[in-house]
Amino acid sequence: MMYIGNDIVEVSRIHRIFKMYHDHFLNKVFSEKEINVVKQKNKDAVYLSGKFAAKEASKKALLSSGIVENISFKSIQVLNHKNGAPYIDLNGIILKDVKDFKVSISHTNTYATAFVILEL
């Protein structure tokens, strides 16, 4: 069975939140591994918006599947392979029914969007 999640985020909204709440926002939404990437590579609001949209889309797919009742954003890590392709890692949560988890992220300077396919 396949489940999908989709999300779109205004980059300006994430920029405002990041500017106002910087570390609080990062610590509430992103894992330690994700925060390290943001800080080491000096990533901007466009990058954060894409990752945030991917987390939202992943959460929607997971919740619609019924395999979880709730999941935190920090538990959904959006990381990148060496070739730059994004992937989802559930930060140590083992969901035995998950066969595959695919994510695609796109953005402009105005919007970021993500689409996720969860296969059980």
Spans of features found by a protein language model:
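Core catalytic alpha/beta fold that binds nucleotide/phospho-ligands
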Residues: M1-L120
